[in-house]
Amino acid sequence: MASELAMTAELPTSPLAIEYVNDFDLMKFEVKKEPAEAERLCHRLPAGSLSSTPLSTPCSSVPSSPSFCAPSPGGQPSAGPTAAPLGSKPQLEELYWMSGYQHHLNPEALNLTPEDAVEALIGAPHHHHHHHQSYESFRPQPFGGEELPPAAHHHNAHHHHHHHHLRLEERFSDDQLVSMSVRELNRQLRGFSKEEVIRLKQKRRTLKNRGYAQSCRYKRVQQRHILENEKCQLQSQVEQLKQEVSRLAKERDLYKEKYEKLAARGFPRETSPPAAPKTTAADFFM
């Protein structure tokens, strides 16, 4: 029976499947005895079913498991687009279902022991393309036709708006925004939203104010340097004038001292000239 199972249902021998199966100890499960009716229920398919999955056992409320029973001799595979082929290989998720719900399987209906199941899993031939398909089935599926939640829509819209906002700001450099006239800027901003235009104009106003403040600061610093240079020149001139004043004061003191010395020696006074004799009228007539 194990060989027939290995032939009809080839299972992948990928390291992932082997490691997952080895994590479970199949020897600790006991074989549950079921009546022969369970075997008939295992082989019986529901009417109008497109899958090969049989009905679950009457005593179990677990959903129907993947089919590990041989199909009935008279059964014909369905020709629908979703119908699985008769000899199709079970997917890797069936292994996960089998390992997770081992206590719901019917070993008596399968006529298998835990050792036979392990041998069938390990001894199956390896197919690279089938392993790739089985592994791809466990990858997270995209949303597809499902509707995205409002948070995702908001995040996508915010990301798109942020990206569009960055593209608008990257379109103009700071120098272009400052040097561009208002008419030219309005012509360039045609077609953009009002919010983005206001934000860009606010950025331009901020840049112009910053440039004006830097210009005022530069002029103030330049004027300070000019005033400091003038101050230094005036201070040097004052020092020169002070030196000239001190030199003139010394020269004045020297001349004053000479004058005082000459005045102390006492120069002789000049005698007055003699007075002319008085002529009388008699002398005049004589």
From Swiss-Prot:
Keywords carried by this UniProt record: Activator, DNA-binding, Nucleus, Phosphoprotein, Transcription, Transcription regulation, Ubl conjugation
Keyword flag Transcription regulation: yes
GO annotation terms (biological process): insulin secretion; response to glucose
Basic residues composition bias: residue spans: 152-166
Cellular compartments per GO CC: nucleus
Domain of life per record: Eukaryota
Region annotated Basic motif, chain positions: 199-224
Post-translational modification: Phosphorylation at Ser-14 and Ser-65 is required for transcription regulation activity and lens differentiation in neuroretina cells. Phosphorylation at Ser-65 may be required for efficient phosphorylation at Thr-53, Thr57 and Ser-61 by GSK3. Ubiquitinated and degraded by the proteasome, following phosphorylation by GSK3.
SMART domains on file: BRLZ (SM00338)
A GO molecular function held by the record: RNA polymerase II cis-regulatory region sequence-specific DNA binding
UniProt KW Transcription regulation keyword: yes
Function: Transcription factor involved in transcription regulation during lens development, including that of crystallin genes. Binds to CRE-type MARE 5'-TGCTGACGTCAGCA-3' and TRE-type MARE 5'-TGCTGACTCAGCA-3' DNA sequences.
Protein name (record): Transcription factor MafA
